[in-house]
Amino acid sequence: MTGFFVLAIYIGVFVVSFFLVTKVVHRATVRDFTSLKTVTFGDESAVRPNRWAGVISILTIFLIWGMFTGSALLPKFLHAPAPFVGTAEFTYTAEANGQRDDATVTVLVHPREQDVEAPEVAPGDGFAKNDSATIAQWRTGLIRVDSNDEITKADGAEVVAINGQPIARGETVKIDSGSVTLSDKGTPNFAPSRGWQMEPLYLPPPEEVWTRTVQVVKEGFRGFTLWEHLGYSLFRVVVGFFFGALVGIPLGYAMGLSNWFRGWFDPIVEFMRPVPPLALIPLVIIWFGIGESGKIILLFLAALWIMAIAARSGVSGVNISKVHAAYSLGASKSQIMRYVIVPNSLPEIFTGARVAMGVCWGTVVAAELVAAEQGAGMMIMVASRFQNTDIVILGIILIGIIGFGIDMLMRYAERILVPWKGKA
C-alpha cells in the first residue's frame, strides 16, 4: 500500500509540475521571431533537458524520501502517518470452568532506540488479572496474559474475546492503536499500527545518511578512507572499460566490414551478450583467482560485448551513398575507413560506451565480492551483512553520482568530438 502511494505522489508531482512550469515558461517567453521557430517532432538533436524538470525531479525524490521516513528536515504536516507510539489498551475475556472474567492489558509502545519499563497497573478483581508490557514501534509482541492469572492456560483457561469481540485461535481483532491476533497456542499477539513510514532498518531518513557520511569521511570504513574506497572502484571500472573498448571496438569494426569476421565472432558475441556478469563470477575466481586481475577481467567482459556490438552497429549504419561518393572521388580503403566509416560510426560507439560504463558501474559491486578489501561495492556488501542500511544507501548514492559525472563527461566529449551527430 505504501508503494502505491509513493508512486501516486510521484506521478502527481510530475503531472502538476509539467503543466505549471510549461504554463509559466510560456507566459514568460518573449514574443519575437525566434519564438515562432518550431521543432520537428522526432528531431532528437533539438531535444534538450528541461532544467526545471531536473531540479523538481530531484527535489521530489528527496521530498518523498523525507515524507515516508519521518525526516526532521521536513515540517511534520508533510510526514506520512507515523507508526503508533504511546500507551495502548485493550481488554481480553478469559473463560475457565464455565466462568468468564475480563482484564485490561496496557502496552507501552516506545521508540526503537529507547529502553523503557512496563507501566505499573493494579491487578484488579477476579481470576483474570490486568497486565502490562512494552513493545518497540514497528515490532509485535506476545503478551502472556495468563502469567499472573489465578487460572492459567494449564488449568484450562482460554482467551475468547478481545474488546468484547469474540476471537478464536488464528483470528485478528482490530483496535484503535493496532491489532490483536490470537496465536495457535491461544496467546494474544499485539501489533501496533505501523503507519505508512518506513522503518529505519529498511530506509533511514536523509539526515541519518548524512550523519553516517560525515562519520565515514572522518573515520573511514574498515581501515580505508572513503576516498580510497571510491578510488579503487573507479580504477577498476576505468581499467576494465578501457580494455573492453580497446578489444571490442576493433572487433566490432572487423565484424562490420568482413563476412568472415562476422560469421566467426557473431555467434560468440550474441551468445555472451545476454549472460549477466554475475554468472561469470565462479569461473573468474577459478580461472584468475581472487586477486585484482579477476575483478578487472569481470569488468572487461562486461564492457567487451557492448562495445563490439556498438562498433558493429556503427559500421552497419554508415550511409552507403557516402561510401560511393568517396570512391568516386578516388579514395582508398584506408581513406574510406578514416574519413567515412570511423566518423559516421562514432555516435553509435559513444552511445555504446555510455551503456558499457553504466553496466561496469553496476558490475563493480559484484566484482568486489571477489575477496575485495576496498571499494564502494565492498562497502555496500559488508554494510548489508550488518544491516547498516545508511552505509548501503551512501554507497549507492556515491556510485550513482560518480557514474552520472562520468556520463556527463562522455556526453561533453561526444559533443566536442562528434559535432555532426544527428545532422545529415
Please annotate each region the language model reported:
Residues 1-5, 35-48, 68-98, 104-144, ...:
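Periplasmic/extracellular loop-to-transmembrane helix junction in inner-membrane transport proteins
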Residues 2-12, 74, 228-237, 286-310, ...:
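Loop-to-helix entry region at the N-terminal start of transmembrane alpha-helices
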Residues 14-31, 316, 393-424:
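C-terminal transmembrane helix and the adjacent membrane-cytosol boundary/short C-terminal tail
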Residues 239-269:
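Transmembrane-helix boundary motif in ABC transporter permease subunits
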Residues 256, 265-306, 313-314:
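Generic hydrophobic transmembrane alpha-helix motif, especially the helices
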Residues 267, 306, 310-353, 376, ...:
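Short cytoplasmic-facing helical segments at TM-TM junctions of multi-pass membrane proteins
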Residues 286, 315, 362-402, 418-424:
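Glycine-rich helix-loop "coupling/hinge" segments at transmembrane-helix boundaries
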Residues 301, 334-366, 390, 394, ...:
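Transmembrane alpha-helices
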